[in-house]
């Protein structure tokens, strides 16, 4: 039996890089934790939507903001601000998100990380394969 497992985002198990950001993954038994790092100007609908093929994010995260500020902008017009220290749950209702201010937005994702990471890689690989087949 293992007494302890130590991991660190300095050496993540996986990384999903995209324009103006990245999503790092650390895998533990029965749990996947994600770390989102988004730079100034990052916006889901601009930087991730083209990879995903959907206009809005539909992942349902539970997490904590480590630094910076971002908004969650629901398709129905409701807007919420996430700031350092906030614990957040965002429903799977279609939503956009973007960084506010010049500081990088960094958050940890305790629920939804595995789905987001897998969803990103599937969409990225599909787009690359589609481009190869078209050429």
What is each stretch, according to the model?
Residues 91-117:
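Ligand-binding loop in jelly-roll beta-barrel domains
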Residues 34, 78-80, 106:
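Short beta-strand segments
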Residues 1-37, 45, 123-126, 133:
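A short, N-terminal "cap"/entry segment at the start of jelly-roll beta-barrel domains
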Residues 35-56:
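Conserved short histidine dyad/triad with adjacent acidic residue
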Residues 75-92:
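Short acidic-glycine-tyrosine-enriched beta hairpin
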Residues 51-76:
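Glycine- and acidic-residue-biased ligand/ion/polar-headgroup-sensing regions
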Residues 40-42, 111-126:
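Glyoxalase I/VOC metalloenzyme domain signal
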